């Protein structure tokens, strides 16, 4: 549609000691650096954000606008999306990454140093608590329930039709 979406990627590779020996440029083996642009979303966490202009704005066959309007609106959409994303990331990415790092570090610390020792302690103590609870049940609650059961077992009811 007249809009360039491919990035022009130019890279120059120099060996560390090449500059000190002569003033010319040493070109490194380009096959070593084939995968220089790595995927920033390898686990596809944000695959739902891969929307294009056609995914958001669609004109049915019966209601087409002028071609120039469609091309200009598509170009404006892509440019504004690109510029606003870059603008927002410049001002928000670093502070939000800092806050997320602090939050993650805090939660990790609490989990490692408080929650897991507490859970392990409870799991170690539970067999002893279970034994004590069984003894209390056998000594106190068992006889109490037995005596209440015997008391109510002597009660009898008779129904008469008057």
From Swiss-Prot:
What molecular function terms (GO) are annotated for this protein? Answer: D1 dopamine receptor binding; molecular adaptor activity; protein heterodimerization activity; protein homodimerization activity; protein kinase binding; protein-macromolecule adaptor activity; scaffold protein binding
PROSITE patterns reported in the protein's UniProt record: CAVEOLIN
Membrane topology listed for this record? Peripheral membrane protein
Q: Which residues are annotated as modified residue Phosphoserine in the UniProt record? A: 20, 23, 36
Side of membrane Cytoplasmic, spans? 1-86, 108-162
Which InterPro entries does the entry mention?
Caveolin, Caveolin_CS
Instruction: Give me any GO biological process, just one.
Output: receptor-mediated endocytosis of virus by host cell
Q: Where in the cell is it found?
A: Nucleus; Cytoplasm; Golgi apparatus membrane; Cell membrane
Q: Which UniProt keywords apply?
A: Cell membrane, Cytoplasm, Golgi apparatus, Membrane, Nucleus, Phosphoprotein
A GO CC term assigned to this protein in UniProt: membrane
Identify residues that carry Phosphotyrosine. Answer: 19, 27
Q: How is it modified after translation?
A: Phosphorylated on serine and tyrosine residues. CAV1 promotes phosphorylation on Ser-23 which then targets the complex to the plasma membrane, lipid rafts and caveolae. Phosphorylation on Ser-36 appears to modulate mitosis in endothelial cells. Phosphorylation on both Tyr-19 and Tyr-27 is required for insulin-induced 'Ser-727' phosphorylation of STAT3 and its activation. Phosphorylation on Tyr-19 is required for insulin-induced phosphorylation of MAPK1 and DNA binding of STAT3. Tyrosine phosphorylation is induced by both EGF and insulin.
Q: What is its main location?
A: nucleus
What would be one Pfam family of this protein? Caveolin
Please give the superkingdom of this protein's source: Eukaryota
Q: Intramembrane features: residues?
A: 87-107
**Description of how the protein assembles with itself and partners:** Monomer or homodimer. Interacts with CAV1; the interaction forms a stable heterooligomeric complex that is required for targeting to lipid rafts and for caveolae formation. Tyrosine phosphorylated forms do not form heterooligomers with the Tyr-19-phosphorylated form existing as a monomer or dimer, and the Tyr-27-form as a monomer only. Interacts (tyrosine phosphorylated form) with the SH2 domain-containing proteins, RASA1, NCK1 and SRC. Interacts (tyrosine phosphorylated form) with INSR, the interaction (Tyr-27-phosphorylated form) is increased on insulin stimulation.
The task this protein performs is described as:
May act as a scaffolding protein within caveolar membranes. Interacts directly with G-protein alpha subunits and can functionally regulate their activity. Acts as an accessory protein in conjunction with CAV1 in targeting to lipid rafts and driving caveolae formation. The Ser-36 phosphorylated form has a role in modulating mitosis in endothelial cells. Positive regulator of cellular mitogenesis of the MAPK signaling pathway. Required for the insulin-stimulated nuclear translocation and activation of MAPK1 and STAT3, and the subsequent regulation of cell cycle progression.
Give the UniProt family note: Belongs to the caveolin family.
Protein name per Swiss-Prot or TrEMBL: Caveolin-2
Question: What organism does the UniProt record list as the source?
Answer: Mus musculus
Instruction: Give the gene symbol.
Output: Cav2
